[in-house]
Amino acid sequence: IIFYLAKINKTFSHYFLEGIGVDYQTQINQVIETIKGDLPTLFEKDISYNIYTQDIYFQDPVNKFKGKVNYRIIFWTLRFHARLFFTEIHFDLHDVYQSAEDIITATWTVRGVLRVPWQAHIFFNGYSTYKLNQDGLIYEHKDTWDRKPGEILQQFFRKGKAHN
């Protein structure tokens, strides 16, 4: 019965969304706007999770996992470590755009000042690639950095400004 009701609900939702003119491209545009709103403040407040599938796959140079619960945990961990280890940290979002029919790309820079007496600065650029399913929800998020994790870690021991 539950499966049958879920199927009816999905069918109803599809017709309802079609009826009000919400199509795939509109959904992608909404996802782009959500990302644009979420990323600049990801070190300060939580992001919106309604644009991701339950089995979202995430990968960056140091992490790889699947599932929305784990995805939530990684963002909580980012905020926790940002408050604990940095006196100042920023996520500068440069651009978010649809790079293919089912792909969204975001370019960004992370920069901050470590909570250490020598006030080490960190700085690295990267881009996020989001893949969307047929419903316009993100099922894969991969981050690519312009430096290896070890190179970023070395910035922690330098005094003052990070080298670009």
Regions from the language model: what does each represent?
Residues I1-N164:
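C-terminal and inter-domain tail/linker signature
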